[in-house]
């Protein structure tokens, strides 16, 4: 690929309303899995001014204090004053949780065969490329790092006027399929009313953006749009309603790869929307790391109650050292993509999900689906 082009991805902060909802959903999931690894959880959250509504379908032997968990997450994010329009101590927490349908349960938990079927039909994508050290597209990887840096600056007191809600958008210029410079940075952060706009712009540019993005990618042509409306005091749930599962592109590949449409947060790993998407990332990353391709996108699909995938598709975008059909044969040989196989391979029945709910589900080495444990076997095919 010799053409010159630009590509844009965005990330949002842990205080973004949709991300508040994702974190509460996954914190409740973690609390349940800590007591009952076989629980069935589909937890959805809505946040708006002064209230949190927790709903969904949960079947479990565990008991968890939904209200306490919800308030703890909001406090941890940093909404600790009514002046922000949202306060962990005073907000209302409403619960509307039911049980999983027995019609779904009988297909997922086959008591005769003891085989775990897929929790629903669906299609999932996994992706990896060589453009960053974590095998992720650079725009989304660096957008997440900008948001992480902002959170650290807020919580440490480095920039005391910061408030929790924020988002950024990063446009990178590519040559020969690799990022070479930053074209545009769009950065909007909630702030206290006493900070001057020019001081905010300088602090974000110098202490956040330039401390994260590679210096060789920044030049006098780089465009910065920092709080371009001039004021962002009203934010969080006071400014916008937040819902679980509305940031699926932020959670995955920033638009660089396709998406099957299912969200992750609040779902136990019997839901292939989540677990199979993680498995697809694991497969794609190991394929690229093994040198079978410089870029790989994988699609897998499932039928409800059926263990084996109904299809596997691979695209290496002309970068493959093997035919796509040969790579699919290797996937069948080296990866168990049944729901139970995925759960066992990645030890997914653990309370590990709250940490995934911010800054992306991929590209961080502490997640088990990021392991490069199949590289040696796959590379033998070259």
Curated annotation (Swiss-Prot):
CDD domains: S-AdoMet_synt (cd18079). PROSITE patterns: ADOMET_SYNTHASE_1, ADOMET_SYNTHASE_2. It holds the Pfam family S-AdoMet_synt_M. Binds 2 divalent ions per subunit. Mg(2+) binds at residue 18. L-methionine binds at residues 57, 100, 240, 271. It is found in: Cytoplasm. The keyword Ion transport does not apply. Pathway: Amino-acid biosynthesis; S-adenosyl-L-methionine biosynthesis; S-adenosyl-L-methionine from L-methionine: step 1/1. Keywords: ATP-binding, Cytoplasm, Magnesium, Metal-binding, Nucleotide-binding, One-carbon metabolism, Potassium, Transferase. ATP binds at residues 16, 165-167, 231-232, 240, 246-247, 267. Its cofactor is Mg(2+); K(+). K(+) binds at residue 44. Its EC number is 2.5.1.6. It catalyses: L-methionine + ATP + H2O = S-adenosyl-L-methionine + phosphate + diphosphate. GO terms for cellular component: cytoplasm. Residues 100-110 are annotated as: Flexible loop. One of its GO terms (biological process) is S-adenosylmethionine biosynthetic process. It is an enzyme of class 2 (transferase). GO terms for molecular function: ATP binding; magnesium ion binding; methionine adenosyltransferase activity. Catalyzes the formation of S-adenosylmethionine (AdoMet) from methionine and ATP. The overall synthetic reaction is composed of two sequential steps, AdoMet formation and the subsequent tripolyphosphate hydrolysis which occurs prior to release of AdoMet from the enzyme. Belongs to the AdoMet synthase family. Homotetramer; dimer of dimers. This is S-adenosylmethionine synthase. It comes from Legionella pneumophila (strain Corby). The lineage of its organism: Bacteria, Pseudomonadati, Pseudomonadota, Gammaproteobacteria, Legionellales.
């Amino acid at each position: 690929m010799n053409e010159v082009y630009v590509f844009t991805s965005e990330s949002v902060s842990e205080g973004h309303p949709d991300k508040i909802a994702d974190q509460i959903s996954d914190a409740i999931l973690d609390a349940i899995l800590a007591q009952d690894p076989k629980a069935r959880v589909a937890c959805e959250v809505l946040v708006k001014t002064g209230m949190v509504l927790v709903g969904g379908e949960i079947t479990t032997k565990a008991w968890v204090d939904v209200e306490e968990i919800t308030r703890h997450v909001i406090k941890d994010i940093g909404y600790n004053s009514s002046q922000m329009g949202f306060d962990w101590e005073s907000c209302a927490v409403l619960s509307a949780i039911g049980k999983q349908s027995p019609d779904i349960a009988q297909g997922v938990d086959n008591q005769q065969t003891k085989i775990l079927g897929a929790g629903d039909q669906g299609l999932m994508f996994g992706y990896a490329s060589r453009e960053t050290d974590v095998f992720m597209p650079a725009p989304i990887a660096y957008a997440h790092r900008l948001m992480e840096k902002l959170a650290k600056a807020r919580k440490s007191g480095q920039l005391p006027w910061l408030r929790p809600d924020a988002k950024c958008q990063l446009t990178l210029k590519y040559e020969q399929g690799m990022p070479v410079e930053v074209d545009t940075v769009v950065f909007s952060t909630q702030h206290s009313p006493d900070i001057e706009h020019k001081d905010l712009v300088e602090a974000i540019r110098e202490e956040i953006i330039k401390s994260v993005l590679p210096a060789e990618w920044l030049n006098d042509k780089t465009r910065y749009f920092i709080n371009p409306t001039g004021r962002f005091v009203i934010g969080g749930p006071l400014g916008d309603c937040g819902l679980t599962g509305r940031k699926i592109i932020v959670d995955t590949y920033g638009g660089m790869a396709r998406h099957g449409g299912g969200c992750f947060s609040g779902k136990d790993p019997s839901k292939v929307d989540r677990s199979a998407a993680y498995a697809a990332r694991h497969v794609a990353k190991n394929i690229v790391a093994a040198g079978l391709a410089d870029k790989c996108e994988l699609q897998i699909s499932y039928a409800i109650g059926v263990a084996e995938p109904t299809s596997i598709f691979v695209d290496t975008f002309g970068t493959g050292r093997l035919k796509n059909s040969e790579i699919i044969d290797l996937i069948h040989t080296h990866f168990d993509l049944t729901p139970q196989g995925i759960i066992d391979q990645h030890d997914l029945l653990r309370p590990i999900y709250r940490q995934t709910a911010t800054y992306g589900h991929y590209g961080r080495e502490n997640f088990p689906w990021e392991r490069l444990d199949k590289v040696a076997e796959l590379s033998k095919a070259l």
